[in-house]
């Protein structure tokens, strides 16, 4: 088991570093002095956080628990993640929705106020610039959270199109929430523990919904969402209140909710079948190929109007040439870039994320295969260090999701 734990930690570290390199380039592998720190940095260190460079930040990859134990504890009890390296921003103005709908695939206009959805920023070729959660606070206020490794290019992309939009009379402005920190509270104890710290009734707040409310005496943006497949919340809190909130959440859980690092977060999202940008989705990958067609609203499919719509809508109609799928496999855990072959030894694709599942106690992976080889039950070979091992295409998520829905 010790060898399996070591392999799990090493594979996750490599996977995060690889996604980091692809999305942000060399500049993030700087000296410790050049790395940014969240307001909880000292709190992480005091609590045994193993700090590593990620997206230009010094972030905890794990604490005293193993990545395997942290993953299982999140699903059985709960986890508290510091995800303040991610970028929250607000778009405001009467033309905010038509502006944003030029850049993303979501039916933002169709969202009810106080609800959100996963979406994708696309380029002119239909490729993914980044994935993001978009929330309609009101018809004139949209709240977004984008990936840390994509922050610079995302903001440059939005700003470039905003300047053009405003030059034609469009009413839209933005605010980047650098004054706030972001905590992710995930797992079955997330809601009951958070309920201790707010007067709002969380039992009537469902997956994908958003509220502005008081938590532990601080004005917070609360979204019922996450990156683990579990029920949970992302809490945008004024940075001066972040430490007190983190301590209060851990205290109220009586030790059952634990501080959890990027390692277990990656393991959890892989078990949930969720993409890691830079690995499972890149600028040459379309949302259709990535299995995110469901995120393109019916109206958007009919009207288009977003960057790359011609390419994406054609793929919806005719089908993509490649598709993201899940795998179970034998042998060593698959790694990113491991070759996928059919039963005749012909190349049909490539692994993008893979590892040992702490919850299923078996190898899981996702990757892209040529259409025709994508159906669940299809037998494949996965090549690892020159040797081929048996694999089978399987449906995702690997671990059933537990989102809180009415």
Swiss-Prot record:
EC main group: transferase
Transit peptide, residues from-to: 1-29
Annotated residues for binding of substrate: 234, 265, 403
GO BP, sorted A to Z: glycine catabolic process
Record field: catalytic activity: N(6)-[(R)-S(8)-aminomethyldihydrolipoyl]-L-lysyl-[protein] + (6S)-5,6,7,8-tetrahydrofolate = N(6)-[(R)-dihydrolipoyl]-L-lysyl-[protein] + (6R)-5,10-methylene-5,6,7,8-tetrahydrofolate + NH4(+)
Domain of life of the source: Eukaryota
Record Pfam families: GCV_T, GCV_T_C
EC number: 2.1.2.10
GO MF annotation, one: aminomethyltransferase activity
Location relative to the cell: Mitochondrion
UniProt cross-references to SUPFAM superfamilies, sorted A to Z: Aminomethyltransferase beta-barrel domain, Folate-binding domain
Family: Belongs to the GcvT family.
Protein name per Swiss-Prot or TrEMBL: Aminomethyltransferase, mitochondrial
Source organism per UniProt: Solanum tuberosum (Potato)
Underlying gene: GDCST
């Amino acid at each position: 088991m010790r060898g399996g734990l070591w392999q799990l930690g090493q594979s996750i570290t490599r996977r995060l570093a690889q996604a980091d390199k692809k999305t942000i380039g060399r500049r993030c592998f700087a000296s410790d002095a050049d790395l940014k720190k969240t307001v909880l940095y000292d709190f992480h260190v005091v609590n045994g956080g193993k700090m590593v460079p990620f997206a230009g930040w010094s972030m905890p990859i794990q604490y005293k628990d193993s990545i395997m134990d942290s993953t299982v504890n999140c699903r059985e009890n709960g986890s508290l993640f510091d995800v303040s390296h991610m970028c929250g921003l607000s778009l405001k103005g009467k033309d905010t929705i038509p502006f944003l709908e030029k850049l993303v695939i979501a039916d933002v206009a169709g969202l009810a106020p106080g609800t959100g959805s996963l979406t994708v920023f696309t380029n002119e070729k239909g490729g993914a610039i980044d994935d993001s959660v978009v929330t309609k606070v009101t018809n004139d206020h949209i709240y977004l959270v984008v990936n840390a490794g994509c922050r610079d290019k995302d903001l440059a992309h939005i700003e470039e199109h905003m300047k053009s939009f405003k030059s034609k009379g469009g009413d839209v402005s933005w605010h980047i929430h650098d004054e706030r920190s972001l905590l992710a509270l995930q797992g079955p104890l997330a809601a009951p523990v958070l309920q201790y710290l707010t007067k709002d009734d969380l039992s009537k707040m469902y997956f994908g919904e958003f509220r502005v409310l008081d938590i532990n005496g601080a004005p917070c943006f609360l979204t019922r969402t996450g990156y683990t497949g579990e029920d949970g919340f992302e809490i945008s809190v004024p940075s001066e209140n972040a430490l007190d909130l983190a301590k209060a959440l851990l205290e109220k859980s009586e030790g059952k909710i634990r501080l959890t690092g990027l390692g277990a977060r990656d393991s959890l999202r892989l078990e949930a079948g969720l993409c890691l940008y830079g690995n499972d989705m890149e600028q040459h990958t379309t949302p259709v190929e990535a299995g995110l067609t469901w995120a393109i609203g019916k109206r958007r499919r009919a009207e288009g109007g977003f960057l790359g719509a011609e390419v994406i809508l054609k793929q919806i109609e005719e089908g993509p040439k490649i598709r993201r799928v899940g795998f179970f496999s034998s042998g060593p855990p698959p790694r990113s870039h491991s070759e996928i072959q059919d039963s005749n030894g012909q190349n049909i694709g490539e692994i993008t994320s893979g590892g040992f599942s702490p919850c299923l106690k078996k190898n899981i992976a996702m990757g892209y295969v040529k259409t025709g080889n994508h159906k669940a039950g299809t037998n494949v070979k996965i090549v690892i260090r020159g040797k081929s091992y048996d694999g089978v295409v399987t449906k995702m998520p690997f671990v059933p999701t537990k989102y809180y829905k009415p």
